[in-house]
From Swiss-Prot:
GO term, biological process aspect, one: mitochondrial electron transport, ubiquinol to cytochrome c
Entry similarity comment: Belongs to the cytochrome b family.
UniProt-recorded name of the protein: Cytochrome b
Residue numbers binding heme b b566: H97, H196
Cofactor(s) essential for the protein: heme b
Gene Ontology MF terms: metal ion binding; ubiquinol-cytochrome-c reductase activity
């Protein structure tokens, strides 16, 4: 008799995705981040669900409901901080996952890659709306500043912003709809993640060499299930260390006073995981130009397959490209630092140089390096 996991309509899908899936024998720990992102998403949905049970999406009570969760609800404080810091872990895993894709040329799986970019946008939108919900000072002003960027769109801009706000400023209507969207989006992300996996399983995983691994496959279970469990344990360890020892480390103290439309915080800035994009936005003096640069800083990922000029897929055997890749990482860290600094000398010029460097590396220098490496192969 055939095993039930191979015949049952539902179990068959699980089996083909997580048990009998043929996987490359040499994928490194950089391939763990996909499963870690899945765990982050499940964790965020669960903690978010329990927070939503006690949260009220109303301007007068939102802030106090979050305070109530932290003070009066059983283990409310740990649920709240797991949710807030879980978002940080989510983005750390996302950046690692995307970086892995760039380094090892995984973007040549076009469908998987493009769904991944959509997932990145969806996650960023969700995190932004979630940051507005506690209705602290930075929540309110962050929402005001970022939504206001849409007014840079010619002709329809102002109407669009007021439509999103549900009024003439960020108010009750805005908070309520942000809560509604923040609740539904993770489920859309989960659905997209399944499509992401569906496309990935059409081709199979890439591996560090970038060479086809069809000749040397091993079953996903037990090899990669146990490896994923180890990754998950390390993720939970890191998250709980953050939550239990320094839960406010990555937060902004400016979000502790309740929202006050009459008082602007000295430095409006988003959570740390948006700072690199925020720095690119601020480095262009023109409003529309800044917004375009902001969107393009992420959307540029879609161009990666077309900018790939190398004869090799992975960067494993391409030292010049490796150097440029790590310069890009350093550049992104510089942008993240600049995004959190006030708009004054020397930060302005550093931010502008780092922004130029970012686009220059991706659009010009890396494709050039690949071409040079192709020619070096002939020697």
């Amino acid at each position: 008799m055939t095993n039930i996991r191979k015949t049952h309509p539902l179990l068959k899908i699980v089996n083909n995705a997580f048990i009998d899936l043929p996987a490359p024998s040499n994928i490194s720990s950089w391939w763990n981040f996909g499963s870690l992102l899945g765990i982050c998403l499940i964790l965020q949905i669960l903690t978010g669900l329990f927070l939503a049970m006690h949260y009220t999406a109303d301007t007068t009570t939102a802030f106090s409901s979050v305070t109530h969760i932290c003070r009066d609800v059983n283990y409310g404080w740990i649920i709240r901080y797991m949710h807030a810091n879980g978002a940080s872990m989510f983005f750390i895993c996302l950046f690692m996952h995307v970086g892995r894709g760039l380094y090892y040329g995984s973007y040549t799986y076009m469908e998987t890659w493009n769904i991944g970019v959509i997932l990145l946008f969806a996650t960023m939108a969700t995190a932004f709306m979630g940051y507005v919900l506690p209705w602290g000072q930075m929540s309110f002003w962050g929402a005001t500043v970022i939504t206001n960027l849409l007014s840079a769109i010619p002709y329809i801009g102002t109407n669009l912003v007021e439509w999103i706000w549900g009024g003439f400023s960020v108010d009750k209507a805005t908070l309520t709809r942000f809560f509604a969207f923040h609740f539904i989006f993770p489920f859309i992300i989960a659905a997209l993640a399944m499509v992401h996996l569906l496309f990935l399983h059409e081709t199979g995983s890439n591996n560090p060499t970038g060479i086809s691994s069809d000749t040397d496959k091993i079953p996903f279970h037990p090899y990669y299930t146990i490896k994923d469990i180890l990754g998950a344990l390390l993720l939970v360890l890191a998250l709980m260390t953050l939550v239990l020892f320094s839960p406010d480390l990555l937060g902004d103290p400016d979000n502790y006073p309740p929202a006050n439309p009459l008082n602007t915080p000295p430095h409006i800035k988003p959570e740390w995981y948006f700072l690199f994009a925020y720095a690119i936005l601020r480095s262009i003096p023109n409003k529309l130009g800044g917004v375009l640069a902001l969107v393009l800083s992420i959307l540029i990922l879609v161009l990666m397959p077309f900018l790939h000029t190398s004869k090799q897929r992975s960067m494993m055997f391409r030292p010049i490209s490796q150097c440029l890749f790590w310069i890009l990482v350093a550049d992104l860290l510089t942008l993240t630092w600049i995004g959190g600094q006030p708009v004054e000398h020397p930060y302005i010029i550093i931010g502008q140089l780092a922004s130029i460097m970012y686009f220059l590396l991706i659009l010009v220098l890396m494709p050039m390096a690949s071409t040079i490496e192709n020619n070096l192969l002939k020697w």
